[in-house]
Each structure stands twice: as C-alpha cells, then as structure tokens.
From Swiss-Prot:
Sites where the protein binds substrate: 63, 114, 158, 165, 189, 241, 259
MF annotations from Gene Ontology: glutaminase activity
Superkingdom of origin: Bacteria
GO BP annotations, alphabetical order: glutamate biosynthetic process; glutamine catabolic process
Pfam (any one): Glutaminase
E.C. numbers: 3.5.1.2
Catalyzed reactions per annotation: L-glutamine + H2O = L-glutamate + NH4(+)
Record's keyword terms, sorted: Hydrolase
Family statement drawn from the similarity comment of this UniProt entry: Belongs to the glutaminase family.
PANTHER family, per database record: GLUTAMINASE (PTHR12544:SF29)
UniProt keyword Hydrolase, yes or no: yes
Gene that encodes the chain: glsA
Protein name in UniProt: Glutaminase
Coiled-coil regions, chain positions: none
Amino acid sequence: MSELQVLLESFHQTYHQQDAGQLACYIPELCKADPNWFAISIVTTDGQTFQVGNCQQTFTIQSISKVFVYGMALADHGQDALLAKVGVEPTGDPFNSLIRLDEDSKRPDNPMINAGAIATTSLIRGNGPTDRLNRLLEMFRRYVGHEVFIDMPVFMSERDTGHRNRAIAHLMLNFGMIDKNIDEALDLYFQQCSVLVNCHDLAVMAATLAHKGINPITQERAVESGYVKDILSVMYTCGMYDFAGEWAYKVGLPAKSGVSGGIMAVVPNRAGIAVFSPLLDEYGNSIRGRRVLEALSQKLGLHLFDLSMGGCGLQAAMDSN
C-alpha cells in the first residue's frame, strides 16, 4: 500500500470523528443527506486513483458546476467578450449576495458567485433550452468520462425555493447585465447545479483541469488548454467564496466548493483532489473537506507558493510502498 493511500485512510479516520457543521437545509432535498457520508479521492494526471470512504455515493454538484460552465462560456465567446459580461474580481461577500453587482461596469463581479454564475449560464449558446442543456450535459460527460444525469427532485426543490436567485436575476436584468429571458437562464442554472456526481467523479474532473484539459482516464479533451489558466485563476481567487483569502493562504490551491458538501482542488500538472462531506461551515464549505485539504496541502507541500516542496511530496507519497 502506498504512503499516499495510508495517509488518506489516516485522515479519513481522524476527521470522520468530527461532526461539526450543518446540512444545507435551505434546499429541502439537500437536508436529506446523511451527515456521516465522507469520502476522499485523488486522481493523478497519469490516471492513478487513491481513495477512501463513500466514494461512490452520488450527490448534486451544486456550485462546483460554475467552474465548468465558465470554461464552456469561455469556449463559446472567448476571454475578452466574456470578461466584458462577467468580471473576475473576488468579493469577500457570501456566494448568494444581492449587493455585489457592479453598476458601473454593468457586470457581476465574478463567475463563482451566484450572480456571475447565472449571467455566465445565460451566455451558453444553443438553439433553445433543450439544446443548451444537452450541450451542458455533454460537456460534463467529457470531464467525468461517463454519462451524467440530473437529480430531478433536487432540481425541482431548487426551482421551487430559489427566490433569492430570482431576485438576483431580476436585479441584473434591471442593470442590463443579462437579457430578458431570465426564467430560461434560471432553469438551466438550477439544472446544472443538480447534475449528479460522486467523489471520484469530482477528482477526475479536477484532474482533467490539472492535465491541461484532457481527461486522464479517457484521454478525451474536455476544454482547450488555453482556457485552463483562466479557469484555475478564478478558482484560486474566488472559488471558496468569502473564505477564499484564508484558503489561498492555508491551502494554496485552486479549488471550488458546493453546498451539497463537495470540494475539489487542482494540483496543476499533478492531480485532482476531491472531498465529500455534507456538513458545512458558515461559508457554505464542507468542514471535513476543508480540513482534509488543509492537512494534505501541509503534509505533501502542495501550496503553489511552497517553494521548498514544489508539490514533490505528492509524487513521493504515490511512489512509496
């Protein structure tokens, strides 16, 4: 057994005993999650997998979807055109903030907050709602390596209770940030958040970004390599919401969280890491996930600015027996 596998099992045992946090019960379907679910998965850019826990337990991708839809919008419109519509500035505000709408620039601050994500989703090209949804599902398929499906009860739950997101969309319509067809954009946004994945899927998706846009399992390209830099930059500065600064300081990896309990992190050129545990902190991030990734970064020297290690601890742990 490799040192990395031993390390993951040790972290799983240690952090599974910690039960702080709350389920995301403002979405009724997410309140049904088992607080004991806990999984850690690492997929390397050469296709190796190291994992422990409930790695096959499915959950909805939620806000982690914003990363991949942003990449799709980049491919549809190009960097300059998309930047004119959605900024890349961190906010320091909660993900569902109503107030971070830049009236001067006529664009939301970044694509990782809900306002920016709704605007980004509204820009996805297609011949009507069904075509746009099919394009999104095909994009997710390339990242994951297999067909993906929407959890319809979660989608309906989000659509029925997503009044705050509707308020955000109407504010953006008022400021001229999105076009008038906001119900269609919101439905597509709720659908993308309701795509089912598991912890291993998330690790493969993160590893695809680490591997310059090529899925390390299927060898299929999911996104052009030129856009990966843009995606990872926004993940690094904005992916963990109002915890993004402390995350960059302590963990030092591009990452994205979702309120269903997933967190994925990218170790460029090396691996994708995913942790799933539905108990959340006050920022909407998985508490166990945050702690595992902090511990992995420190133990293996994964911080992008840890010049003494340069991520070599990960390779050493993989190679040991």
